[in-house]
């Protein structure tokens, strides 16, 4: 039995909480009037695991009345299992193939906020799609801040190592040039409250013109 067949078997036997929600992302609503953008370009969030892509993405979606999609959750909905299970059955190469296929589809949608996985920028075709199809925001955080945010998260297969802090540092060295390569805007997340970050992002997005 090949890896894909194994994954299908795992999917059928081990449904995961939240899959239904992930499979049907809906536009977020809020009490404040929707912020205005002079374009319908999708907004793509890139950055390391723990940078705040999902949390900030949801905040932006609420402010802009846009649909929010988390690429990892989209993959989990399609496969029926969590990301660590995909890694376990198909390895990182198999996961990256699935990730690339989902990213190519999602980046063609208009008026969405898409939170990508930390390693989505590794593939050249992914970077090209991100650069050409929307506004890319690199959410930047220090290794220490990333470690603090991810140290208790068991849903991070790449950090299942003897020294997760050192692993984060190595991943940052390899990936940061790629984040900067695709980024239209770079935002330091630090310890700033999410609402403040989102509020500071809105005028930058309103003023931005895609080159």
UniProtKB/Swiss-Prot annotation:
It catalyses: shikimate + ATP = 3-phosphoshikimate + ADP + H(+). Pathway: Metabolic intermediate biosynthesis; chorismate biosynthesis; chorismate from D-erythrose 4-phosphate and phosphoenolpyruvate: step 5/7. It comes from Bordetella pertussis (strain Tohama I / ATCC BAA-589 / NCTC 13251). Keywords: Amino-acid biosynthesis, Aromatic amino acid biosynthesis, ATP-binding, Cytoplasm, Kinase, Magnesium, Metal-binding, Nucleotide-binding, Transferase. InterPro entries: P-loop_NTPase, Shikimate/glucono_kinase, Shikimate_kinase/TSH1, Shikimate_kinase_CS. Monomer. This is Shikimate kinase. Catalyzes the specific phosphorylation of the 3-hydroxyl group of shikimic acid using ATP as a cosubstrate. Residues 1-24 are annotated as: Disordered. Its main location: cytoplasm. It is found in: Cytoplasm. GO terms for biological process: amino acid biosynthetic process; aromatic amino acid family biosynthetic process; chorismate biosynthetic process. Residues 1-13 have a biased composition (Low complexity). Binds 1 Mg(2+) ion per subunit. ATP binds at residues 50-55, 156. Substrate binds at residues 72, 96, 118, 175. Its cofactor is Mg(2+). Belongs to the shikimate kinase family. The gene is aroK. GO terms for molecular function: ATP binding; magnesium ion binding; shikimate kinase activity. It is an enzyme of class 2 (transferase). Mg(2+) binds at residue 54. GO terms for cellular component: cytosol. Its EC number is 2.7.1.71.
């Amino acid at each position: 039995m090949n890896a894909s067949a194994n994954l299908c078997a795992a999917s059928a036997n081990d449904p995961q909480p939240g899959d239904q929600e992930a499979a049907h992302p809906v536009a977020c609503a809020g009490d404040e009037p929707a912020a205005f953008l002079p374009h319908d370009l999708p907004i793509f969030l890139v950055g390391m695991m723990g940078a705040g892509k999902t949390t900030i993405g949801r905040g932006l979606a609420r402010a802009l009345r846009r649909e929010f999609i988390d690429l990892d959750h989209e993959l989990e909905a399609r496969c029926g299992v969590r990301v660590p299970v995909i890694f376990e059955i198909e390895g990182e190469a198999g996961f990256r193939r699935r990730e690339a296929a989902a990213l190519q589809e999602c980046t063609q949608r208009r008026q969405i906020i898409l939170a990508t996985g930390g390693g989505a920028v590794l593939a050249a075709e992914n970077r090209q799609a991100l650069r050409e199809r929307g506004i890319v925001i690199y959410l930047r955080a220090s290794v220490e801040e990333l470690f603090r945010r991810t140290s208790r998260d068991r849903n991070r297969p790449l950090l299942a190592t003897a020294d997760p802090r050192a692993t984060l540092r190595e991943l940052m060295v390899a990936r940061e040039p790629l984040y900067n390569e695709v980024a239209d805007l770079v935002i330091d997340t630090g310890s700033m409250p999410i609402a403040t970050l989102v509020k500071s992002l809105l005028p930058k997005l309103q003023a931005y013109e895609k080159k």
